[in-house]
């Protein structure tokens, strides 16, 4: 159903009239494994950049942006409208940012709640919008950010910091960029990873690889098509119960040891036809063991996990899969942090896990406490360690 709808959108795009030479018009499609999770189309003229972004997770959300340009191509005003078409728990949002010299004013209306701010900005600041499944590459490409990178970055390890303006809030933050080659540029992802961008000879983005980020998405450039019309169709699927839903739902797994409850909370990512070990979950790197916040185990009585005694309380669980097929379970004294905030100085123990294989790929990541074993399973792997009351 999804692939048929997406194919029809691309075919329609190919039959549309091309824009005049003075304009730029294109689109980006973003995928998470087998699922298409975001679309963007944009048009640029000498005085204006206008685009639409549709995000499908957890439900269809349509974002419309407009940038007004001065004669030198700099942005004087940005407008962003966020409309939740198939995500009823998300508030609508209208944001206007006025840029004058070295300052900006932002007017944010979130479901009727107004907030106005004013702040200084750095020279050359550019608007950005991150959807949760990739950046707005139409904004970056249209505004020539990457043409500027080609001019100012030498190949190798040279980086440049460009001040950016979050179109959804008006806040500013520096973004780091690293040029790997004439056609490869890395964009900083919250200072924890890089998004790898492939450019053409003119400096336009043709693809973006977010596999090293927490989003794990791939984006590629395609012909312009009608994103708002596509959003209506996907919103109808949401209402019919046929949407994608949450990317990684939070799960509370309950087990019992000699009548005492043990609880594990974790985010459960989906396989989505991807190879997990070595790609989604890299070898040789500590993994949050799930998604979203750090995975946590809680018990009101002392436990023996493997051969290690843990006092009653809460602990975060991490894993370290290795190229040779072995896996270590890491128990950490911190808990409540996000899954990217691992701090090895709080580790209590690293212990080997028993490694097994499932007969067929498992779609949902899962953690369970059954028959005296704490098991972690996904795709074709299952890792286990003994667990008991002290």
Task: Locate each region found by the language model.
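Pro/Ala/Gly-rich low-complexity, hydrophilic intrinsically disordered segments
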Residues: 216-252
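Short, exposed beta-strand-loop hairpins at the edges of beta-sheets
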Residues: 205-212, 373-379
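Tryptophan-anchored aromatic micro-motifs
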Residues: 22-36, 40, 158-164
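Solvent-exposed helix/loop surface patches that form functional interfaces
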Residues: 92-184
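Sec-dependent N-terminal signal peptides
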Residues: 4-13
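N-terminal mature ectodomain segment of secretory-pathway/periplasmic proteins
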Residues: 31-112, 176-182, 186-189, 203, ...
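Extended, well-structured beta-strand/loop surface patches
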Residues: 243, 265-312, 318-390
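Predominantly extracellular/luminal regions of secreted and cell-surface proteins
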Residues: 250-273
């Amino acid at each position: 159903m999804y692939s048929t709808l997406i194919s029809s959108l691309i075919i329609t795009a190919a039959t549309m009239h091309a824009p005049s030479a003075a304009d730029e018009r294109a689109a980006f499609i973003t995928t998470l494994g087998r699922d298409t999770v975001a679309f963007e189309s944009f048009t640029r003229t000498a005085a204006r950049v206008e685009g639409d972004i549709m995000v499908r997770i957890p439900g269809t959300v349509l974002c419309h942006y407009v940038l007004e340009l001065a004669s030198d191509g700099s942005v004087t005003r940005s407008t962003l409208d966020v409309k939740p078409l198939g995500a009823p728990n998300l508030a609508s949002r209208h944001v206007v940012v006025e840029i004058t010299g070295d300052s900006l004013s932002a007017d944010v209306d979130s479901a009727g709640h107004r907030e106005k701010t004013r702040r200084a900005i750095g020279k050359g600041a550019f608007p950005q919008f991150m959807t949760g499944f990739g950046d707005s590459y139409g904004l970056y490409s249209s505004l020539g950010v990457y043409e500027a990178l080609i001019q100012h970055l030498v190949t190798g390890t040279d980086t440049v910091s460009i001040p950016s303006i979050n179109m959804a809030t008006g806040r500013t933050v520096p973004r780091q960029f690293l040029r790997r080659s004439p056609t490869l540029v890395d964009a900083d992802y919250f200072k924890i990873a890089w998004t790898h961008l492939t450019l053409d000879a003119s400096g336009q983005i043709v693809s973006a690889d977010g596999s090293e980020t927490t989003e794990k998405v791939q984006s590629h450039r395609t012909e312009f098509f009608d994103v708002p019309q596509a959003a209506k169709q996907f919103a109808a699927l949401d209402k019919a119960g046929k949407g994608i839903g949450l990317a990684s739902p939070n799960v509370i797994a309950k087990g019992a040891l000699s009548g005492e409850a043990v609880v594990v909370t974790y985010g459960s990512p989906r396989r989505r036809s991807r190879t997990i070990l070595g790609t989604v979950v890299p070898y040789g790197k500590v993994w949050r063991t799930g998604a979203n916040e750090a995975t946590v185990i809680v018990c009101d009585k002392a436990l023996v996990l493997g051969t290690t005694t843990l006092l009653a309380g809460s602990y975060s669980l991490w894993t370290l899969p290795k190229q040779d097929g072995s896996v270590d379970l890491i128990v950490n004294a911190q808990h409540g942090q996000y899954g990217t905030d691992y701090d090895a100085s709080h580790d209590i123990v690293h212990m080997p896990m028993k490694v097994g294989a499932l007969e067929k790929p498992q779609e949902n990541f899962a953690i369970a406490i059954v028959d005296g074993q704490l098991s972690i399973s996904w795709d074709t792997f299952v890792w286990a360690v003994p667990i008991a009351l002290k």
